[in-house]
Amino acid sequence: MRQHQVADQLFGGGEMGALMRACDWSKTPLGAVEQWPQSLRSALSICLSSRFPMAIYWGADGLLLYNDAWRPIVGDKHPWSLGRPAQEVWPEIWDSIGPEFAHVLATGEGVFHSDERLDMHRYGYTEECFFDYTLNPIRGESGRVDGILNVVSETTYRVLSDRRTRLLRELAAKTSAAKTVEETCALMVEALSSDPADIPLALLYMVDPEAKAACLCTGTEPPPAVPYQPEQVCLAPPQSAPQASQGWPIAAVVQTAQP
C-alpha cells in the first residue's frame, strides 16, 4: 500500500490529521508511514480520534505527535514541534519531565500529576502553568515500551483563580479589624506578602492632605529586579512633575480614581 493511502487511513480528519498527511515522514526520524509499527499506528489512531488533549512521544528520543485538542498546550512552538524530540520541544522543563519519561520507558509504569506546576516558554515568555497529566507506556510488538501516551488537561486558569481568590479573602480577613490607617496598611502588606507569585511587589503610598504628593507608607520586600522605590511621588501633571516621579503614574490614578 502506498504511503498516501496509509496516511489517509491513519491520520483521519482535523487540523493535525491534515498536517500529518502533508508531511513527508520518510525524511524524518520516524521514517515512511507504511513502515511504522502497528503499536504506533493504533496509539496514533486513538490519539487523533479523541477530542481530549493527547500526545504521543515515540521512541527513545520521544518524537512528538499530537491531536487538535493538545495543540494549544505547545503554543507558538506549533507546527515546528511536530515530530521533534521531546527535549528539543521542552528544554525549559526537561529537568522536571525528563526523568519521568525515562522512568516510564524503563519500568513500564505510568505517571500521574494533579495541578503540577511547569514554568513553560511557549508564547515568547516564561509563564507559570499548571496541568493534570498522565504519562502512559505504549508497548510495541516486542513487549517493550516503545513510546509514551500523554493525556493532559491544563488547569492554569483555575489554579490561578483559586489562588487569587484566597488572597482576596486573606486580605479582607486581616484588615477587617484594623482601627487606624497605619494598622490597615501594615495588615494589607502582611496579607500581600503571603502570595509573592501573584504579588511580587506591593508599595502603599499615602496622599498628603493637600494632595500634592504621595508618600511611601510601607510595602512588601522588593525583588532584586526592582531596586528603586521612590519615597515620595509628586502628584502634579506629568509635564510639571519632577523627573523622578514621571515613571510612576500615581498622579493619574489619584486624579481619575481609575486603576
Residue positions per predicted region:
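PAS-associated C-terminal cap
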Residues: 1-3, 153-163
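GAF sensory/regulatory domain recognition
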Residues: 21, 61-85, 190-193, 197, ...
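Soluble sensory domains of the PAS superfamily and closely related sensory modules
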Residues: 21-27, 38, 45-49, 92-121, ...
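Sensory modules in modular signal-transduction proteins
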Residues: 33-66, 197
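Amphipathic alpha-helical coiled-coil segments that mediate homodimerization
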Residues: 39-43, 59, 167-175, 180-196, ...
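Output-coupling edge of small sensory domains
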Residues: 116-118, 136-141
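Flexible loop/coil segments at beta-strand boundaries within sensory signal-transduction domains
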Residues: 123-125, 138-144, 210
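PAS-family sensory domains
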Residues: 133-134, 144-154
